[in-house]
């Protein structure tokens, strides 16, 4: 596995701790922009989607080019259930699950990494591309959390 993927799998998510440092739980849960997710909802989305991603990776490894539907957090009962948990519980699960996920993924063989699945918008992607997609999607939400936290720290 390329080091740029393995390094991000190991460490990228940990920036969340720094991004929300100094914010109260009330601030983390505050909706800064009307109709948009709070920091908390972005974090819950990352935590919930990570579990879905693991399931999809397993389907890719076990199947022959499976096709996945578009994911919608609002339609995912796990997302809604997880919104009732504390920020600490969500972060703990995100970090623990990522550690387990990464330790398995860095062991994938070349044959594993070239297995494919269909993405509804991007078409056929191999497992390495799926990992990159996962990390870029996560980075997008981390940047959103960064912007929301900056806004909250100004007020």
Name every feature range the model reports, one short phrase each.
Residues 29-73, 116-155:
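Short, contiguous alpha-helical
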Residues 1-17:
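Extreme N-terminal tail/first-helix region
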Residues 22-27, 106-114, 150-155:
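Surface-exposed helix-capping loop/turn segments at secondary-structure junctions
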Residues 13, 17-21, 51-54, 58, ...:
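Structural signal for well-ordered, non-membrane alpha-helices
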Residues 1-2, 79-84, 120-127:
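A short, mixed-charge helix-start or loop-turn motif at secondary-structure junctions
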């Amino acid at each position: 596995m390329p080091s740029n993927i393995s390094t991000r799998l190991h460490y990228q998510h940990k920036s969340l701790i720094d991004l929300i440092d100094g914010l109260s739980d009330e601030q983390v849960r505050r909706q800064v922009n009307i109709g948009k997710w709070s920091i908390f909802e972005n974090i819950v989305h990352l935590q919930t989607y990570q579990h879905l991603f693991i399931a999809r990776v397993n389907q890719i490894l076990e199947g022959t080019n499976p096709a996945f539907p578009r994911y919608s957090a609002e339609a995912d009962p796990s997302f809604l259930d997880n919104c009732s948990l504390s920020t600490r519980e969500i972060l703990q699960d995100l970090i623990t699950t990522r550690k387990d996920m990464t330790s398995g993924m860095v062991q994938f063989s070349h044959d594993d990494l070239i297995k494919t699945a269909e993405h509804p918008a991007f078409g056929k992607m191999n497992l390495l591309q799926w990992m990159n997609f996962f990390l870029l999607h996560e980075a997008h939400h981390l940047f959103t959390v960064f912007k929301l936290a900056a806004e909250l720290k100004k007020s």
